[in-house]
């Protein structure tokens, strides 16, 4: 059995397929997706279709067990669907137009109920194998246990405060994404696996990263769309 985490996909369906092929996962394996499945990239609907297939394969025992965490972009999409105040404008300026374009059909935006339901059941945080998985990070002023006992969804989805902070209060290593890095960040109590697959046009970025745990072995594939 292997435990993997996969970083921010951001609509890069072909890149995700290449990474999954590279990992050669079995039904005995476990995979935690760090969130941000949609926005900015060319094929957000196809990414969600792929994740739904992985979920179905896991339920049938034909694929690895999967945990799909929620990212801030996934939350923005849900807020838009729910008609939350200012949700469209916030989503629009954060890459949501690429996602909406993928759902255009006959001049209308048609988002499948299965995609909405999938995002609605994504948790914000997950513990497994001696690691805590979360999209953005945790509050560095509190221990990991305190963060989990008093969860702050906005911190889990949006924070970057931990990246330059003293993490001495964190008693458990945290695996996150959200903030793109040219290389995976690998510290004793922090792993960041967002290597900016969707930012392939920027120097140093443009790979999708997985990490195998607890070995901390990184697997990266270049952007393919």
Regions found by a protein language model. Give the residues of each.
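Short coil/turn segments at beta-strand junctions that form active-site/ligand-binding loops
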Residues: 1, 27-30, 64-65, 124, ...
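Acidic, His/Gly-enriched loop-helix segments that form or flank divalent-metal centers
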Residues: 93-192, 196-206, 213-224
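Detector for methionine-enriched segments
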Residues: 1, 76-77, 97, 104
